[in-house]
Structure formats: structure tokens, C-alpha cells
Amino acid sequence: MDHPSTSSLPRKKVKAGVKKAGKKTGKKTTGKKKTTPSAIGNRKGKGAACLLVLLAVLSYLAALSLGLYIMTGCISTTAQSNNIYLAELSTNTTYDMSLRVGYFGGCVSVTELTEAPYTGRNSSTQTSTHCVSNLRRKNLDDLSEDLWEPLKLNSSTIQSSLQTFFNTTLPQAKHLQENVFFCEPPLVHLLLFFVTGIMLFVAMTGTSRKRSYRAMLVTAIALSAFSLALALVTVLGSLQSMNALLNTSASGAQRALGDSLYISRGKAMLGVQGALVAIVAVFYLTMGVVFVRRTPEGGAGYIIQAFQNVRGPLKRMGRR
């Protein structure tokens, strides 16, 4: 009777030993460290975030440079600034003369024919250009002297023709600056873009748990929208104003005003303004993607939560 019970005991011990051995081997195999898909995803995410920040910084600097370039058009001849103008008043009579108008400054160019000695033939042309930083001065006589005196013209005949040209074009140039091409929209856009860019870069280093942080972010978003709208208004305003002056569509380039006087649009200025709008849009879009990637809720949840935190203080201020 006792024989079957004694024979079953070793079998149970063997099975238990097999189970223990299996557990030990399992521990050894799982002890090795392997690269998980989540770690690879984190590396890719950090690389994408760095690229986005780099794109934001580059677009921010490029937009600021273009904005300053637009505002300083026709202020001086350095960096080809005299080629960035809104409109040009020109004549092609005995001497080719032109007056280019920017938001603040203006440039005059005079082309003379130089004769080769002992031949009497026209050998070449010489163009003299000078710019003034402020074309909005009230005294036209002083303004005309500041424009033509540094040119160092060769004959008194050219000076007389240039003075007649200024008597006709300077009042029109001042009218264009004061009543057609307003300097306020591009100037306010540049200031708002500079301020909102700094606010957004500072917000990247903060935390979304503080209400002051979210209030600053909402303010930056509102000012950013206004800045982008001003950039768009500037380029469309320049295009529509010149279309009205030329009495043509965007493809028209020049119109005769009478007495061999012409007005033409500044195509380079229009191109730079369009590029500025595109770069500003890229900057704000990139910054939006950067902030959306920081929150698991996504962009809509992030903005809604920020507005909810600001809505309470605004209601209290309205009640007061």
C-alpha cells in the first residue's frame, strides 16, 4: 500500500526543478537591454523640434531684415537701396532724369552723355545718383538743393533742366508719400513682428501651468494675427495704389503724365513685400507647430485652455 505513494514523490520534485530552471533561463534572456521603438521615436521627435526652432529663428531674422530693407528704401545708395522704391517719376527729354520715391526717402538720378575728345562722338553715358533720407520736408527749395548739389553736374544747362524737373516732380512725390503710400502700416507691422517674435521665443522656455504665461501667449497670438494682417495690407495697398495711378492692372508698368513725364511702379519693392508676407506666415506657422507639439491635447485644446484661463479676469474687468 505504501509503494505507490513513495514512487510519486520524486516525480513532483523533478517537475518543480524544471519549472525553476525555466524561470532562471527566462531571467537571463530578459536581462539584455534593447533599443525600443519609443526611444527611436523620441530621438526623431527631438530632431524635428530642433529643425522647427531653427526654421523659426531663420525666418524671424529674414523677415526683420526684409522689413528694415523696405522701410529704408531710397534712403541711400548702399546695398542697392535706391532700387527699392514705390514709384518713379522720370523724363526722357534732353537728359534722362528720374526721382524715385520710398516710404521716407527719395533718390534722384541724372544720365549725361559724355563726348570723346577731338571726335565729337557720344562715347558713353554717365549716371549720377543721390538720395536723401527724408523727402517729407516742407521747404521744397531746400529739398531740391540737397538733391542736386552732391551730384557734381558738368554744365549749368543740366542744373537748369534738373531744377525745372524738380519744380514739377517734388510736389507730386510729396503727395505720393503723404496721401498714397502711408508709412504707418509697414512701420507698425515691423514693430509688432519684432515684439511678438520675442514674446513667442520667451514663451517657448516657460511652462503652461501659470496663468500669466497663458495670458502672455494669448496676447502674442492676437498681436501676431494683427502683424500678419498689416503685412498683407501693405503689399495689397501698394499694388492697388499703383494700379489706380497707372489706370491699369497689375501687369501695367508705366503711364505718361504729359510733357514727357512718366510714372512707373517699383516692381522690386512689390516683390520684396510679397516675400515678406510669405516669410512672416512661415514664421508664425512654425511657431504654432512648435507649441502644438509641446502639448498632448493638440493645438485646439491648447488654445481653448489658454482662452478659458484668460476669460475669467477679462469678465471681472468688464464688470468693474
UniProtKB/Swiss-Prot annotation:
Q: Which GO terms describe its cellular component?
A: membrane
Per UniProt, subcellular location reads as:
Membrane
Biological process per Gene Ontology, one example term: terpenoid biosynthetic process
Which coarse location class describes where this protein primarily resides?
membrane
Composition-biased stretches (Basic residues): 10-35
The pathway noted for it is: Secondary metabolite biosynthesis; terpenoid biosynthesis
Keywords on record: Glycoprotein, Membrane, Transmembrane, Transmembrane helix
Query: Where are glycans found on this sequence?
Result: 92, 122, 154, 167, 247
Q: How does it sit in the membrane?
A: Multi-pass membrane protein
Keyword Transmembrane among UniProt keywords: yes
InterPro entries for this protein: Dni1/Fig1
Region feature (Disordered):
1-40
Q: Where are the transmembrane segments?
A: 51-71, 186-206, 216-236, 272-292
What's this chain's function?
Part of the gene cluster that mediates the biosynthesis of an ophiobolin family sesterterpenoid.
- What name is this protein filed under? Uncharacterized ophiobolin family sesterterpenoid biosynthesis cluster protein
Supply the source organism for this entry: Aspergillus terreus
